[in-house]
């Protein structure tokens, strides 16, 4: 370290800031923390994992097998996509699980950093700590304030670590999820709360309004196989968004989605055809044995890999807290996303563009988003307001702000909550303009009866252990939707109970009443007063103080709302409220880099330097500009990195063209007016925060008849929104369709009649009256048709269909390493004594297992779904 830090002035400044005494002569010895050596993971193999789970009474499952992956000709699987094969977009062969032998899968997660294995991974930002030290010792203003920020930053480095935790931390998280689902407030289905699918959908209209898929551009109906959503002749791709670099999951462990696109499509197509056959044979909710047998064959569609989430963890909780990602099987992700993504991607409806909406879906705190929230509170300081985003609920009442989180939100879900999501998407999203459904019976069965059990109360793979998942698997395609539904139900019951104050016992009693656990994360009393104080004390200098590209003279006061992790501060220069990342989160992000997020750039010359530039500029954007010491340090390091890149002759623009993909804040920067120059100035921050043009809402015109959740809950309580419980069959009847068509014809006929040229007021009123009556007739019939659809789907809202798997209590059997080996299907299909037997006897040549014979038949079927 430079001698500048060992001068008497520097040593005195640093020791005072850190509150240190009796330090050594060399500043570096005590200023720069040594790389952390994490404790040894107590769980080293599957036997120890099984014993840990058994001690905590966690349900382990008997191992199930998957047919070996076999290469098949892509052109034969998808004749209509031969053009993709010819162009090289698709490979000539496709792997599908259709071999004559089966194996029991295994997945061993990677945890970094590890005990006694030094690695650069997860190291703190040494350059930023050194730069902050230099800036602190050479600063002239506010040494006490900057000393506090410096100490907080170094404490963050000492107390936290970026990494993927431990096996014991993952298992501890599983056990904690089970305790939430089955413990003091066991999960309750909507039916146990007296809520029908239609009632939940009516509430979701207020908390998460949606429109038709694709918005004004339209979208193909849910009536085909997934491969038919690709049209090479027209260059159209209607598949949901796919992150190609992410894990493919079962049955392709170790591969990415980009490597297995055709494989996943082949599985989805085959599965859809099989479901279609079951539907044709009459497999409904009352008789679902055929579907159940089908799901037994495709059991792996409901088994996610238990992936450790790389995050900034507290070192003291390294062995007890590792967040899990339920890495869904790629085919499952495709099926669920095909139902939800086209709708949600075009339904960014929230508090900013839909009156009286309480949703924060698609909300961005920039572009005037934070200002809209704060000014709304200040405009009606004595009103009660609330907002919802997934498992986050915000309540403002009695001049106090409450930030509430569902406790381990995913653990509170039941399959019926996922079913409510399906019902809502089908009845409010997948409908035609005339009210008829834009889906067929096969997709309705997938959505209502199968999809819920694929991701809720399903299973996961950890090492070679197959385990029950309590609640929904975190990270599945519907995680947000299911969590948002849970929060909507909780807020609805809070309104029904008379809106008790969150501090009250009546409010906390909602946990037991709903089976939804929650905790109050933050509470700000006298919020209007706190906001006024922040305005009065707002800084007069710096980026958004006076409009100069300089750090402020002192830290701008913030009001820590914890609104999706953001605080609010007031800009005198812009005369508006702007977002800054919660200081604790900002320091954590600054202390521990996550590394280059854009995997496509890895290995390119200058990419790592470009990442440092993007990271520092992004930290400035999200709030670093508000803290003088942090801002000066980030700006200095960015300038040095730019010079470094310039000296190497590497143009920055070529590396940062898609710079937002290089940062952990990419979701926030999406659709913001940011140029590719990527240099944070006062003008840059002003463009970032100026109120932009709001997206036009995309809301189903047949719905959202009741404005506001409070009125909606009141109407539900009085029975005004209840649907008849009679079942009208899954498809609209021909009679229903004829009524719609007849009404539409009447409307069109009258609308096309020549209009009167008379100046007589009564003649013109006759024209208007005829049009009004025809329009009312059409809308009435369209809504009646929708009611038919609702009633039909209620017929599918009984118990969901799921594969039944026996429990395995023997830790030796469930963890025996032999299950990780590839075995003949006749001995590997979940039979424990065969798994533990000696030797391997392969089946005779050409002999296929029952499951393999089924798979062969499925491949040979070329018929599509038209039921």
Curated annotation (Swiss-Prot):
Residues 845-867 are annotated as: Disordered. The lineage of its organism: Viruses, Riboviria, Orthornavirae, Birnaviridae, Blosnavirus. GTP binds at residues 249-256. Its EC number is 2.7.7.48. The gene is VP1. RNA-dependent RNA polymerase which is found both free and covalently attached to the genomic RNA. May also contain guanylyl and methyl transferase activities. GO terms for molecular function: GTP binding; RNA-directed RNA polymerase activity. It is found in: Virion. This is RNA-directed RNA polymerase. Keywords: Covalent protein-RNA linkage, GTP-binding, Nucleotide-binding, Nucleotidyltransferase, Phosphoprotein, RNA-directed RNA polymerase, Transferase, Viral RNA replication, Virion. It catalyses: RNA(n) + a ribonucleoside 5'-triphosphate = RNA(n+1) + diphosphate. Interacts with VP3 in the cytoplasm. GO terms for cellular component: virion component. PROSITE patterns: RDRP_DSRNA_BIR. It comes from Blotched snakehead virus.
């Amino acid at each position: 370290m430079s001698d500048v830090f060992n001068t008497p002035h520097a040593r005195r400044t640093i020791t005072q800031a850190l509150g240190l005494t009796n330090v050594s002569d060399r500043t570096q010895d005590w200023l720069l923390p040594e790389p952390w050596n994490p404790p040894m993971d107590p769980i080293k193999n599957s036997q120890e994992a099984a014993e840990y789970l058994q001690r905590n009474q966690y349900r382990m499952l008997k191992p199930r097998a998957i047919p070996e992956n076999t290469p098949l000709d892509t052109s034969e699987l998808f004749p209509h996509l031969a053009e993709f094969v010819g162009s090289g977009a698709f490979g000539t062969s496709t792997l599908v699980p259709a071999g004559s032998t089966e194996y029991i899968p295994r997945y061993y997660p990677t945890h970094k950093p590890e005990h006694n294995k030094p690695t650069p991974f997860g190291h703190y930002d040494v350059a930023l700590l050194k730069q902050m030290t230099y800036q602190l010792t050479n600063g002239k203003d506010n040494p006490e304030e900057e000393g506090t920020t410096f100490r907080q930053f170094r404490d963050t480095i000492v107390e936290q670590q970026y990494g993927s935790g431990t096996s014991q931390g993952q298992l501890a998280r599983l056990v904690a999820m089970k305790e939430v689902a089955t413990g003091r407030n066991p999960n309750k289905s909507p039916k146990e709360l007296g809520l029908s699918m239609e009632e939940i959908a009516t509430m979701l209209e207020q908390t998460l309004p949606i429109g038709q898929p694709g918005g004004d551009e339209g979208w193909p109906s849910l009536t085909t196989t997934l491969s038919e959503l690709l049209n090479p002749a027209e260059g159209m791709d209607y598949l949901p968004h796919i992150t190609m670099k992410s894990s493919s999951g079962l049955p392709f462990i170790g591969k990415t989605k980009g490597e297995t696109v055709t494989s996943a499509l082949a599985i989805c197509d085959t599965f859809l055809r099989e479901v279609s056959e079951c539907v044709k044979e009459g497999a409904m909710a009352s008789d679902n044995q055929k579907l159940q047998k089908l799901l037994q064959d495709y059991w792996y569609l409901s088994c996610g890999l238990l992936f450790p989430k790389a995050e900034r963890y507290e070192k003291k909780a390294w062995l007890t807290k590792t967040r899990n990602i339920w890495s869904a099987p790629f085919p499952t992700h495709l099926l669920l996303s095909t139902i939800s993504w086209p709708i949600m991607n075009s339904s960014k409806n929230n508090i900013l563009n839909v009156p009286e909406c309480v949703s924060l879906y698609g909300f961005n705190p920039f572009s005037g988003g934070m200002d809209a929230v704060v000014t709304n509170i200040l405009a009606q300081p004595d009103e009660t307001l609330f907002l919802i985003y997934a498992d986050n609920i915000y309540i403002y009442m009695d001049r106090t702000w409450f930030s509430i989180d569902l406790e381990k939100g995913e653990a509170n879900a039941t399959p019926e909550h996922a079913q409510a999501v399906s019902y809502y998407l089908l009845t409010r999203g997948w409908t035609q303009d005339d009210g008829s459904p834009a889906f067929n019976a096969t997709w309705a069965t997938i959505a209502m009866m199968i999809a819920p059990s694929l991701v809720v109360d399903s299973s996961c793979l950890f090492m070679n252990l197959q385990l029950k998942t309590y609640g929904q698997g975190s990270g599945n395609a519907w995680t947000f939707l299911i969590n948002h539904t849970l929060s909507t139900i909780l807020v609805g019951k809070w309104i029904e109970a008379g809106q008790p104050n969150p501090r009250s016992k009546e409010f906390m009693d909602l946990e037991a009443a709903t089976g939804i656990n929650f905790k109050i994360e933050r509470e700000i009393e006298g919020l209007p007063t706190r906001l006024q104080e922040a305005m009065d004390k707002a800084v007069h200098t710096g980026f958004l103080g006076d409009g100069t590209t300089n750090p402020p003279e002192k830290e701008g006061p913030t009001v820590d709302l914890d609104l999706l992790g953001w605080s609010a501060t007031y800009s005198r220069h812009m005369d508006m409220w702007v977002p800054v990342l919660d200081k604790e989160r900002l320091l954590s992000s600054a202390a521990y880099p996550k590394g280059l997020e854009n995997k496509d750039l890895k290995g390119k010359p200058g990419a790592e330097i470009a990442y440092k530039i993007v990271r520092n500029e992004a930290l400035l954007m999200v709030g670093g500009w508000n803290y003088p010491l942090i801002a000066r340090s980030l700006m200095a390091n960015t300038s040095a990195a730019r010079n470094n890149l310039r000296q190497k002759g590497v143009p920055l623009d070529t590396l940062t063209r898609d710079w937002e993909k290089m940062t952990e804040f990419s979701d926030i920067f999406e659709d913001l007016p940011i140029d590719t120059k990527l240099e944070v100035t006062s003008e840059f921050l002003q463009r970032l925060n100026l109120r932009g043009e709001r997206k036009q809402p995309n809301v189903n015109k047949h719905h959202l008849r009741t404005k506001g959740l409070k009125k909606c809950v009141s109407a539900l309580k009085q029975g005004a929104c209840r649907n008849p419980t009679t079942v009208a069959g899954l498809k609209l009847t021909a009679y229903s369709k004829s009524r719609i068509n007849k009404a539409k014809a009447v409307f069109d006929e009258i609308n096309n009649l020549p209009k009167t040229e008379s100046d007589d007021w009564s003649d013109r009123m006759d024209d208007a009256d005829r049009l009004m009556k025809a329009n009312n007739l059409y809308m009435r019939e369209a809504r009646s048709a929708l009611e038919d659809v609702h009633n039909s789907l209620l017929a599918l809202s009984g118990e969901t269909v799921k594969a039944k798997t026996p429990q395995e209590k023997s830790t030796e059997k469930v963890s025996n390493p032999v299950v990780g080996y590839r075995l003949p299907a006749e001995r590997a299909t979940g039979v424990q004594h065969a798994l533990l037997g000696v030797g391997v006897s392969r089946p005779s040549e050409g002999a296929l297992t029952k499951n393999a014979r089924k798979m062969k038949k499925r491949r040979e079927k070329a018929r599509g779904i038209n039921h």
